[in-house]
Amino acid sequence: MDLKLALVSAFPPGQQSLNEYGLHLACEMAAREDVSEVVVLADRLPAPRTELVLDPKIRVVRCWEFNSVVAGASILTALTREGVDAAVWNIQTATFGDRELPAALGLMAPATARLLGTPSGVIAHNILAGIDLENTQLKGQRLRQAVIRAAGAIVTRAMLAATYTTVTLRSYLDHLSAVFPNKEVHLVPHGTFDTAAQDIIPVENRPRRL
């Protein structure tokens, strides 16, 4: 079965966080024999730039803007238009914006996509619980920090409502498993797909070296 997959991610030559990870992920997805096309639903560039030359199986559709409250809706529209079999969301807390509302609305889109019929897997590179708000622009703002954490709990629950959720740090896995014991969360460390698995050569069959 040939699969048409979507990858929602910041993507080069853009400068947003996780763009290089998105590139490597798209290439690994396209390398699979059971994948016919990878449609990258990427962030729009602030100024025209030359797009990368990619594998013929990879097509980039720049359909959402950073800090836009309609970024999630734009992605959902693109998923429907493209008719993909499934979507992978390569995201972190500030993927869709560095302001609270656009960031939160964007992070709730994977669960919405699933409800609309597109199986959606989330690769979460960080979670709000792992961020020390005292080391951000919210330092000393106790009330606002409390509001952000409450909203963050709602957003995290929404992210866990995707078809599957993976995290890249053991501490995130431990936290989510403790707070949401009924949710299935997987650990996929950074760099897992960088090199293909290789058979280990038995010591006795290896060439002798000085």
Feature locations, PLM:
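Acceptor-binding helix/loop patch of EC 2.4 sugar-transfer enzymes
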Residues: 120-148
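Alpha-helix capping/helix-boundary segments
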Residues: 46, 128, 171-173
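Conserved donor-binding/catalytic core segment of Leloir-type glycosyltransferases
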Residues: 204-210
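Conserved nucleotide-sugar phosphate-binding/catalytic loop shared by glycosyltransferases and other
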Residues: 48-74, 78-81
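Helix-loop-beta element that forms the nucleotide-linked donor phosphate-binding surface
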Residues: 157-161, 173-192, 200
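Short N-terminal targeting/anchoring amphipathic segment
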Residues: 61-62, 76-104, 118-121
